[in-house]
Amino acid sequence: MSAARIYLAAGGTGGHIFPALAVVEALNAKGHETCLFTDKRGANLLAGIADLPVRLYVISAASPFQSGLLRRIIATGKLGLGALSSLWHIGLRRPEVMIGFGGYPSFAPVLIARLLGVPVMVHEQNAYLGRANR
């Protein structure tokens, strides 16, 4: 089996990041190239890991389900910036597959991959699908 370019996208909390990191390690062990999209919270969680086994793309993201019109507008703008950044990275080096692990930072990369015709897989570790994975 030849090595594949596999991108992953995960929210900025441990419940999203650490399952994604486990999949990254398994994919790397099989010789695949991996990249992980997350927000600055996820990057901060991973900052303490020496020899991080994945290329990290930190994108802008926020929940659009906040209270207050101004917060929703700002969150929508952040998601838009995350989508543009995702379009740049995914369009530049088309992955063979994108795996989403939920959380708002995963929404834009997964959506962009889907729009570009990249096959998408979703990993849901909870009993019910979250908003981003739905």
Language-model segments: residues:
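Active-site-proximal region of nucleotide-activated glycan assembly enzymes
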Residues: S2, E33, R41, P53-R55, ...
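Conserved nucleotide-sugar phosphate-binding/catalytic loop shared by glycosyltransferases and other
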Residues: A3-G11, N28-K78
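Structural detector of well-ordered beta-strand residues that form the stable sheet scaffold
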Residues: Y7, C35, M98-I99, M121
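A short, glycine/small-residue-rich beta-strand->loop->alpha-helix junction that serves as a flexible
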Residues: L8-L21
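Gly/Ala-rich phosphate-binding loop of Rossmann-like dinucleotide-binding domains
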Residues: V24, N28, R114
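An aromatic- and histidine-rich active-site surface loop
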Residues: R41-L46, P95-L116
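Short beta->alpha connector loops at strand-helix junctions that form conserved
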Residues: V58-A62, F101, V122-N126
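An amphipathic, basic-hydrophobic alpha-helix
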Residues: F65-V97, F107, L115
